[in-house]
Structures are given as C-alpha cells and as structure tokens.
Amino acid sequence: MDALVLSMIAWITASTGLIVSEPPRIAFVRDSHFQQQFHSEDAQAKPEATTPNHEKPAAEKFFSVQGFYLRATATVYLPETWQLAALRDQSTLLHELVHHAQRLNKVGVACPGQLERQAYDLQVAWLREQGVAQPFDLIGIDEFTMLMLTACLPPDG
C-alpha cells in the first residue's frame, strides 16, 4: 500500500506541480460505519469525497461515498472492502490523495467544486493512463453528473 501511495503522489506531483511533503494517514472503516463516519459531525469540517457508485440504483448514486479526505486530520478514509488490486479502488485513493495535495499546497479556489473538479479530472486521466477506455463508466459517473458535482453555484440569497 505504501508503494502505491508514493507512486500516486509522484504522479500527482508530475501532473500538477503540487508538492506533497508527507503522505496522509489512511484509515479503513467498516462498511456499516463508513457512510455514518462521512456524515458525522467531525467529518463536516470540510471532507472531500468520491461519491458516485455505478453499482447502486440511480436514486442512491449520490449517497454512496467511495472514499473521503478529512482536511482537519489529513486522513484518507476508505471502506474496509477497498481492494489494492482493484483499479477502481486505486482510483478512489488517487482522488483522495489529490485532496491531500490541494490541502498541503493551500490551493485557492472560488468554490469547493473546483477542488472536486481537479480531483475528478486527475482520477480520469490516471485511469486512462492505466488503459481504461471508459473511465467514467468504471468510476460510475457520467460527465454531466461530474459537472453538477463540481459546479460553482451562486450563494442563496
């Protein structure tokens, strides 16, 4: 796992110029507690998450968290069902590592959606480099949904 994390961090740095001086902590959470952990009060301190899941019915797509990064503790949370050999799971880890790199480099954006956009764009690019012809299908998201998840919306008022 350490070798994968280090190689992904090197790839992120080469792709973005973002420097990662220290890898994040990685924690595995039991499936029964994974969604609860993401939605907990502590996690509301700016978690960034990989959410879509193509294995769920459309109504549940947006509620299935695949992984998340908690900025306050510099921790990537993954479900205990995460598999090192599964390319889709690896790409979830990469997505969350992008959020870690963004945090360490204090990436400034107009809205949180821009952080997600960069993470998804890099996740898709990485999957394409791994030979995945249809990366959106593999991660269970279409381009329109990604646009909606990453849009900067005006504040209510």
Q: At which residue positions do the language-model features occur?
A:
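Auxiliary, metal-adjacent structural segments of Zn-dependent hydrolase domains
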Residues: 1-76, 82-83, 130-132
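Post-HExxH zinc-binding segment in Zn-dependent metallohydrolases
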Residues: 112-145
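Active-site recognition of the HExxH zinc-binding catalytic motif
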Residues: 91-104
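Stable alpha-helical elements in mature extracytoplasmic
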Residues: 4-8, 89-93, 115-118, 122-123
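Short, low-complexity, Pro/Ser/Thr/Gly-rich segments in the mature regions of secreted, periplasmic
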Residues: 142-157
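Surface-exposed, polar/charged faces of alpha-helical domains
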Residues: 103-110, 132
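Short pre-active-site segment immediately N-terminal to the catalytic Zn-binding motif
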Residues: 77-93
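Mature extracytoplasmic domains of secretory-pathway proteins
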Residues: 84-86, 98-101, 109
